[in-house]
C-alpha cells in the first residue's frame, strides 16, 4: 500500500463543537444503516473464488483534496491485496464515487450485477467504507469509559449471487467492524497514540475481509 504520511485530522473548535452536538443528538458514531445482517444457510465466504468486486470509499469533503483522492485509492488497493492473500482473485473490479450515504445504502446493485454477469463472475462482492470524525466513547467494557475526538472507518460487506442477485451474506456497519485511530490504556484511561491513516486502512480492511479467511 502506498505511504503518504496522512495523520489524524486536527479538530478545530468548530469541528469539536459540531462533533459534540452530533454525539448528543445521536448522529455521530451511530449505525443507522438500513441493511440487515443476514447469511444464506450453509454459505461461507471462503467458498468465493473469482468474484466481481464493487468498492465505494467515502471521504469527507473537509479532508485536503490530495488526500481525498489518495485515501480511496489506498483503501481499494488494500481490499484487492487482502482478497488475494485469501486466494481470491477478482475477475472484474469497479469503484464508485463516495457519497454521504451510509455504507451499503444508495448503491446501484442492478448495474453492478449486470456488469458482473458480463465478466463471468458467480458472485458480486461489495465493500462499502466511509471515513468519519466524531466524538466516540472508548473503554466501555473496562468501566472507565472515555469519550473524545476520533477518526474512524465504518464499513459494510455484501456478497450476492450473480445468477439471481440474491444476497448470500450481508454485514452492515457495526461496532465490531469499526476501525478507530485511538489507542488507549483502559486501565489508566490514558491515550497511548493515534494511528496513521495507513494503519487505520489496514485495520478496517482486515475487519471487513475477515469472513474470507475464517475457517
Show which residues each predicted segment covers.
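C-terminal/domain-edge helix-coil "capping" segments
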Residues: 27-48, 147-215
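Sec-dependent bacterial lipoprotein signal peptides
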Residues: 1-26
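Surface-exposed short loop/turn segments
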Residues: 106-167
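Alpha-helix termination/capping residues and helix-transition junctions
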Residues: 21, 45, 118-121
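Solvent-exposed loop/turn segments at secondary-structure junctions
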Residues: 59-61, 130-135, 177
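Stable alpha-helical elements in mature extracytoplasmic
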Residues: 71, 75, 79, 108-112, ...
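A structural "domain/chain start" motif
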Residues: 27-98, 208-215
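Surface-exposed acidic loop/strand-edge motifs in secreted or periplasmic proteins
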Residues: 89-114
Amino acid at each position: 500500500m502506498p505511504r503518504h504520511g496522512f495523520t489524524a485530522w486536527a479538530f478545530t473548535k468548530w469541528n469539536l463543537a459540531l462533533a459534540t452536538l452530533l454525539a448528543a443528538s445521536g448522529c455521530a458514531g451511530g449505525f443507522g444503516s438500513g441493511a440487515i445482517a443476514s447469511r444464506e444457510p450453509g454459505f461461507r465466504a471462503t467458498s468465493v473464488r473469482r468474484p466481481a468486486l464493487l468498492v465505494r470509499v467515502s471521504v469527507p469533503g473537509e479532508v485536503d483534496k490530495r488526500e481525498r483522492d489518495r485515501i480511496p485509492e489506498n483503501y481499494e488497493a488494500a481490499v484487492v491485496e487482502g482478497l488475494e492473500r485469501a486466494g481470491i482473485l477478482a475477475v472484474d473490479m469497479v469503484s464508485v464515487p463516495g457519497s454521504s450515504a451510509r455504507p451499503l445504502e444508495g448503491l446501484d446493485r442492478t448495474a453492478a450485477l449486470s456488469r458482473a454477469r458480463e465478466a463471468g463472475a458467480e458472485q458480486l462482492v461489495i465493500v462499502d467504507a466511509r471515513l468519519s470524525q466524531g466524538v466516540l466513547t472508548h473503554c466501555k467494557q473496562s468501566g472507565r469509559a472515555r469519550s473524545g475526538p476520533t477518526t474512524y472507518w465504518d464499513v459494510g460487506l455484501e456478497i450476492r449471487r450473480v445468477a439471481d442477485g440474491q444476497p448470500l451474506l450481508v454485514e452492515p456497519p457495526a461496532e465490531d467492524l469499526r476501525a478507530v485511530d485511538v489507542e488507549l490504556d483502559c486501565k489508566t484511561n490514558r491515550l497511548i497514540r493515534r494511528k496513521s491513516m495507513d494503519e487505520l486502512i489496514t485495520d478496517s480492511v482486515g475487519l471487513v475481509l475477515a469472513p474470507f479467511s475464517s475457517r
